[in-house]
From Swiss-Prot:
Coiled-coil segments on the chain, per record: none
Cystine pairings recorded for this chain: none
Locations listed in the record: Cytoplasm, Cytoskeleton
Region spans: Disordered: 251-290
Organism encoding this protein: Trypanosoma brucei brucei
Protein's name according to its UniProt entry: Microtubule-associated protein P320
Amino acid sequence: SEYRQKRTVGEEVTTDMRHVDESHFLTTTHEAYKPIDPSEYRQKRTVGEEVTTDMRHVDESHFLTTTHEAYKPIDPSEYRQKRTVGEEVTTDMRHVDESHFLTTTHEAYKPIDPSEYRQKRTVGEEVTTDMRHVDESHFLTTTHEAYKPIDPSEYRQKRTVGEEVTTNMRHVDESHFLTTTHEAYKPIDPSEYRQKRTVGEEVTTDMRHVDESHFLTTTHEAYKPIDPSEYRQKRTVGEEVTTDMRHVDESHFLTTTHEAYKPIDPSEYRQKRTVGEEVTTDMRHVDESH
């Protein structure tokens, strides 16, 4: 009876056929797709509007833009510049100047006077200053001294007072080029690898590494042979001896939560009936539209 729709008082029995309406499934909003009345498309006319308004779109420039004024025929007179009072009629010829289109800044491209390139001389400067650039090393660098011919004697190291002449042979040492730190690669004395013994240490310490588990890990204790007794669980006082067999239960490995996979009692699937529920409730699912 839950599936039966509630009828309002006075609703006819034929309500079961409400879904027969053809437009029912067109949309969830029944009104949205109902047949459209063509008269709805007709624009509402204001009082006094002439009947000839249907022809308003005949104007040729109507579709040029949504802004009617923007594309209306342009009056050529609009392009004529406004002249101020007293301006001469010959102002139309102002653009005849040849350098007008060279730049927007008229002065920038005016013919250049070559005399502008001549440097100003200070009072008393000699006339021969025009030849200052004849020096051969002038263009070697902007810093004249940087590229002047190098004196080979500059490469010779300065010797301190009393240094022997034989210092030129200092680089003959074989280990000189091994590193910039001469001491770092000098021949290593094997005796350096021998560990220093503390006073009283026995001579037999050289054999300390003979222990088999020495190289198993840097933590010697971590890999020492494991005592199987360590795996045995500690029993609390009073625990029965049969606790060793606790894992024999078949469902032990089903899950870490023992109760979750225990055998299910089929009676658990039976729904609880409320007091007074009829015995025929088992057939509630027979309804075809369930």
